[in-house]
């Protein structure tokens, strides 16, 4: 696999760290008044999920991770595995709960997810950035009840719980940002 120099570091770049594929979360170039410049990098290990901070000297190189990101459609779950299918080749891949992480609460059948494969095995499942889900349970919003924060918890069809505005009712479909789990808008 290719080697990456510190000047090629950016968020989302996949590298090998301690024999495990990792993803760069944040990269900060530091040029002190005295001494050599360096990069302060936050890295998430893709298999263990650990986040660590590491410094690299300017010009140092790191081995790139031999991982492959593929877009696959979510099919179903059998309780132990979540099954995905490649829409071109119709090849199916099963991901376990460890690879899925928090993505499970955002998955809707036939949604296209990005799956990171390492040695042919799924290690990370990334749901679409925005999903449209139906509200199955929430408190009724009372007119004029805006003294608080202006929000209320709502349970969605997948079981996820998000804060929504008071005017949103049971049965409505809302758009949710899966990266931070926040309400975006109602779907007309």
Swiss-Prot record:
Modified residues (N6-(3,6-diaminohexanoyl)-5-hydroxylysine): 34
Single GO cellular component term: cytoplasm
Subcellular location, record wording: Cytoplasm
GO MF, one annotated term: translation elongation factor activity
GO biological process, one term: peptide biosynthetic process
One Pfam family cited in the UniProt record for this chain: EFP_N
Chief site of localization: cytoplasm
InterPro entries from the UniProt entry: Elong-fact-P_C (IPR015365), NA-bd_OB-fold (IPR012340), Rib_uL2_dom2 (IPR014722), Transl_elong_fac_P/YeiP (IPR020599), Transl_elong_KOW-like (IPR013185), Transl_elong_P/YeiP_cen (IPR001059), Transl_elong_P/YeiP_CS (IPR013852), Transl_elongation_fac_P (IPR011768)
Signal peptide boundaries: none
Keyword tags: Cytoplasm, Elongation factor, Hydroxylation, Protein biosynthesis
Known pathway: Protein biosynthesis; polypeptide chain elongation
PTM comment: May be beta-lysylated on the epsilon-amino group of Lys-34 by the combined action of EpmA and EpmB, and then hydroxylated on the C5 position of the same residue by EpmC (if this protein is present). Lysylation is critical for the stimulatory effect of EF-P on peptide-bond formation. The lysylation moiety may extend toward the peptidyltransferase center and stabilize the terminal 3-CCA end of the tRNA. Hydroxylation of the C5 position on Lys-34 may allow additional potential stabilizing hydrogen-bond interactions with the P-tRNA.
Cross-referenced PANTHER family: ELONGATION FACTOR P, ELONGATION FACTOR P (EF-P) FAMILY PROTEIN
Role description: Involved in peptide bond synthesis. Alleviates ribosome stalling that occurs when 3 or more consecutive Pro residues or the sequence PPG is present in a protein, possibly by augmenting the peptidyl transferase activity of the ribosome. Modification of Lys-34 is required for alleviation.
Family: Belongs to the elongation factor P family.
Protein name, UniProt field: Elongation factor P
Source taxonomy: Bacteria, Pseudomonadati, Pseudomonadota, Gammaproteobacteria, Alteromonadales
């Amino acid at each position: 696999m290719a080697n990456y120099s510190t000047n090629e570091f950016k968020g989302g770049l996949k590298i090998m760290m301690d024999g495990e594929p990792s993803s760069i979360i944040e990269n900060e170039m530091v040029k002190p008044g005295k001494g050599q410049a360096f990069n302060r990098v936050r890295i998430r290990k893709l298999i263990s999920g650990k986040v660590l901070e590491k410094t690299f000297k300017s010009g140092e190189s790191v081995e790139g991770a031999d991982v492959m990101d593929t877009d696959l459609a979510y099919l179903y779950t059998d309780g132990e595995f979540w099954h995905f299918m490649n829409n071109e080749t119709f090849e199916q891949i099963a991901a376990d709960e460890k690879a899925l992480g928090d993505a499970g609460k955002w998955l809707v059948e036939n949604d296209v997810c990005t799956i990171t494969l390492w040695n042919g095995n799924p290690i990370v499942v990334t749901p679409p950035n925005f999903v449209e889900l139906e509200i199955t349970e929430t408190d009724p919003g009372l007119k004029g009840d805006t003294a608080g924060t202006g929000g209320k918890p709502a349970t969605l069809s997948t079981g996820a719980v998000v804060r929504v505005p008071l005017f949103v009712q049971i049965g409505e479909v809302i758009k949710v940002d899966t990266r931070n789990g926040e309400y975006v808008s109602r779907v007309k």
